[in-house]
Amino acid sequence: MFVFLQLQKRPEVRVANGCKSLIINNLKRKEMITNCCPAATALPTVPSETCAQNFGQIQKIIFQRIMNGSTKNSIADGTSAGNAGLLASWTALKTANDDTKIAVSPFIEAPADDGGDARTFGGGNDTLNGIEIIIGSNPVNFSCRLNGKKQDIIAELKKLMCESQANNLGVFLVNENGNIEGIKDGGSWYPIPVQKLFVGDKMHGNWDGPDYNNMSFSFVPGYSDKLDVLVLDASALAL
């Protein structure tokens, strides 16, 4: 009997400012197990806080492919025609027939995050002074419920799992005010990369509650470093 092993290409490793990062399917994943040596000339400058930022309740999710061919999908900031500040720009993307197309979830409920804590090694006699070493960060995991939804809607959402398996799926989040949360870099908005999207089969609520489907995915470590909130000219909940 012959056994054939498929060798996968190792992720590309880049080094900048003494810190390693992995390039996986065109996605940059920051690694906290950094060899930050030599040290920077001075400590970083932390911006002064002018006002708090809290996004609120996530009520809809906008899915989009991360890559548009060989370039990243992006929407220019601003309120000119086709720019991110106009609801019409997002509405047009719903009917696109290429990599720029967006798919919008129905209303979701019970949104919750967990994880995001440090991955550590050691403690006790294994490390100096018994202090654990931080070797990375666990992903932030997102979960929600789709209550009382027709299963033809769920069947279409399940197709997005294939996009996730290809590491080519991102999301924009929509809150109760119709604002959008995404990655803002320079003058453009980008979808937040996610992995491990799962859309579950129908669960019957029977006497005590509505029927529902579970949905979940994971953000990659460092996903929120350039996260920002976009206020449109009209509520994105209308998408």
Question: What is each of the regions a protein language model found here?
Answer:
Residues 1-31:
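N-terminal amphipathic/basic-hydrophobic helices that include classical n-h-c signal peptides
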Residues 15, 32-33, 47, 158:
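Secretory pathway export signals and precursors
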Residues 19, 36-37, 144, 162:
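Generic recognition of cysteine residues
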Residues 31, 88-95, 155, 159, ...:
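Polar/charged alpha-helical tracts
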Residues 33-143, 192-210:
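Solvent-exposed edge beta-strands and adjacent loop segments
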Residues 66, 147-151, 174-177, 210, ...:
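Generic structural motif
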Residues 115-188:
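Structured, beta-strand-rich domain cores
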Residues 188-239:
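Mixed-charge, glycine-accented linear interaction segment located at domain edges/termini
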